[in-house]
Design a protein with these regions (language model features):
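Conserved, single-site charged/polar hotspot
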Residues: 1-197
């Protein structure tokens, strides 16, 4: 079951059902689907701001591609034998974001929300993460093994100064102190059962 409008679009030999709804209603489903709707209020509020920021960046990116101001992600040649293809929401041409983990998990109202979810959405309404005058592309992963990766190495071939690698249990404000590009060090890290949140 979904809120909002349901629009049907024929694209070639495919029929798309597109759910259109206000951003804040979408976010209630997303933060209830991506994590537990019974999480603490502060965690839900943080997730609402992160998800709202990410969504608005995707919507702007799609609009810029439609207007010809920005191009879609292109493969990056690493060598003659190897290339990297970044799969991003610009792969969507008929809608802003999809309903799966590729974008943000959205399950309509089938995923139960809670009063805390509604309170988190209301308390953070309109709040965004900003870096200078740019809305942050606040992508996230549900698990990182104890060390997050820099944006440019896992999401898109673009440096984002606000999404750097961090160690989960490192003191706040310190840089990662482990070099996981070294195979032996990475293996030791994984086998040590690091604190990962």
């Amino acid at each position: 079951t979904f809120l909002g409008k349901l629009r049907f679009v024929v694209d070639g030999d495919k029929l798309w059902a597109i759910n259109e709804l206000p951003v804040e209603r979408y976010l209630a489903s997303v933060i209830s689907s991506e994590m537990s709707a019974t999480s603490s209020l502060e965690l839900l509020k943080a997730h609402a701001v992160i998800s709202r920021s990410w969504l608005l960046v995707q919507m702007r990116r799609r609009k810029a591609i439609e207007m010809g101001v920005q191009t879609a992600s292109a493969p990056v040649k690493v060598s003659d034998e190897e290339g990297v293809v970044w799969y991003d929401s610009d792969a969507h041409t008929l809608f802003d974001v999809c309903a799966d983990d590729h974008c943000q998990r959205y399950q309509g109202i089938t995923k139960a929300t809670s009063p805390h979810v509604e309170e988190a959405i209301k308390a953070t309404r309109g709040q965004l993460l900003m870096n200078r005058k740019e809305i942050c592309d606040a992508r996230f992963s549900k698990c990182c093994g104890g060390v997050s990766e820099e944006y440019e190495y896992c999401w898109d071939n673009t440096h984002k100064p606000y999404l750097l690698s961090v160690v989960d249990n490192a003191p706040l404000g310190t840089a990662p102190t482990i070099d996981l590009t070294d195979e032996k060090t990475a293996q030791e890290w994984i086998l040590s059962s690091p604190e990962a949140f």
